[in-house]
Amino acid sequence: MHIVFFSTSNVFRAEEILQEANIECRVVPTPVQDKAYCGVCIQTECEQAKEFMDDMEFEVLE
């Protein structure tokens, strides 16, 4: 799944949070969509990753 943000700084903040929680993730280019997101996003297979970012605005693309 891809976790997309409107801000690049939030992508790198989320990456740090997930790595500290030992959740495997990586920063990748954002898939092309109808909406405007920043150019990179988080890619992970861990569904629980969303729980660590409850104070951040994001959307999930599957």
Q: What residue ranges belong to the model's regions?
A:
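Amphipathic, hydrophobic secondary-structure cores in small proteins
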Residues: 8-9, 19, 24-37
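N-terminal acidic leader/helix
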Residues: 1-17
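Residues in well-ordered beta-strands of folded domains
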Residues: 4, 28, 43
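Generic non-transmembrane alpha-helical segments
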Residues: 14-17, 21, 51-56
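C-terminal structural segments of small proteins and small subunits
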Residues: 31-33, 37-62
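Structural motif
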Residues: 2, 24-26, 59
